[in-house]
């Protein structure tokens, strides 16, 4: 069976107090166990994910760095969105691949970055 999992950006940030990359990586590891269970049961799994909290954190970091030293560039919101997609996809791809390898499952895990149009309003 083909299964599509939709993970909200908040789902990748289990503890609202811990917004660190390490905390989000640990949440991805926990998610990877469930995904690997589905794959081990013979399902084809695709994952889509949000990025709300992560894109906000990245944007705030970029803006703060620019305030400290205006030589640090600002980036348009679509580019910051791509940063967050790459970062989340990287964590999910690696943790799922690691979990599959632990189980002796040789499957490709791939990440696709999308493009979005953000409404000015």
Please annotate each region the language model reported.
Residues 1-48, 58-64:
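N-terminal glycine-/serine-/threonine-rich phosphate-binding loop
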